Amino acid sequence: MRILLINPPSPERLGAPLLGFQHVAAALLRVGHEVRVIDAAARHFTHDANWIAAQVRDFRPRFVGLALFTRWVWHAYRLLPALREAGCLLVAGGAHTTVCPQETLEHGFDVALTGEAELSVVALAQALERGDALASVPGAHVRQSDGSVLQGPAAGFIEDLDALAPPHTAQHLFDPLWYDPSGRESVPGGVLTSRGCPARCTFCANVITGRGFRFRSAASVVHELNALHARSGNSFFPFWDDAFTAKIPRLHDLCAAIERDVQFDLRFSAITRANIVTPDLLRRLKGAGLVHINFGVESGDDEILRIIKKGVSTQHVVRALEWAKAEGLQTACNFMLGFPEDTPATLQRTLRFMQQIAPLVDSFSTLGVAVPFPGTPLYEDHHAALGFTRWWLDEAYSHYADFPAVEDRHRFHRHYIDDANLDLDFFRYDPPTRAMIRECLRFKGEHNLRAMGLLRDPVFEPQAPMAALA
């Protein structure tokens, strides 16, 4: 069966294909389907909707699957008329579809697949081949000709991650020129060693991979690393797990397997929480190739951390950073600014905390202002009262790029000295709160530019002191 997968156009220009997108393509390839992909969000993808529709007509797939993400779903919906004219079954997947399946059908999709897609998309293709009812597919929501919707059985989480087709087996489907015009022969790759996160943060939906933590065997991870290196020649790979260190015992097995069986000098980065690392663990991970660790901090005010159910304290953060630097690791910290409960005082405490830990931090995240995504308490608790219900369907919210296609790091950080998300004003900040958010953004930008030796710029020259807070 011919199947076309599309990552729709978006202002966010990607420097590498999404891992989830690769996983779905690999799952279909493994069972014998003829698969093509179009990554219209790639940094150097230049074709328009008419070109995409022409590819659909030429390929004549049995269905077209689109990956939907809340921030850019408006662009995906705008693409649908051209795809509909090409004449094919339209299938929605991805994080936004999992939270809002009915909405995707209302906007023109025939089928919405919720949850982890690797198994459900294969089941959908099988149902089409056999002539079975599409509503028999786990996680499927199927629009009928009369407008009604049939819903399949619930899609459970994939427990045996080793059984999934390795994403690198689909990398040949992605044109390297979409990501790098220099002519490199392979696309960049990353690795997932686990899925799920046990945290309960109010800003995170965690709807696809869930809160239960599942992990791959060490042998499976090592096999993928060796295959990626053989294909690309790269020795550095980012590990994209939401909570890499959530199960410490499995990491000792992984480190041993890496040291024993990886056939090159591996270097990797990881993302985790400050309360689930230890000095011994960081030392062990460094020995296996860890060079960079990113901690989700979110706020420097312990009361805000309690309200957002982060489960981490500022003391945890300081301690984890000290341990990481003692091992010579590069460090990064993510902060979120402007939660509904934030005040000028809580944000000033966050700024002071950033200043306190700055000597231990190589870089702060360039993103900052809180965005309420559907499926999160941050959205559900506030959208009706503050008037941003289904904000993602408004074109005005759909043109700010979280990651602009900027190759120059200096320009990149200048872009984020004033996060455009602040102008969306989801939580109706008063002037003092808005001013403090800008001060926090400014500090992060200055810190990052200073680390790169690029602070000489009039944008970052000292300004008048902040007005005293009441």
Regions found by a protein language model. Name each.
Residues 102-106, 281, 341-356:
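Catalytic cores of alpha/beta
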Residues 62, 110, 234-237, 291, ...:
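Short acidic/polar active-site loop segments enriched in Thr and Asp
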Residues 1-224, 231:
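Acidic, low-complexity intrinsically disordered segments
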Residues 16, 168-332, 339, 352:
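Radical SAM [4Fe-4S] cluster-binding motif and immediate context
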Residues 3, 90, 137-138, 237, ...:
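Hydrophobic/aromatic residues located in beta-strands of well-ordered beta-sheets
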Residues 2-8, 29-37, 53-56, 145, ...:
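Radical SAM enzyme core and accessory elements
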Residues 12, 101, 199, 249, ...:
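Flexible glycine/acidic-rich beta-alpha junction loops that bind and position SAM and/or redox cofactors
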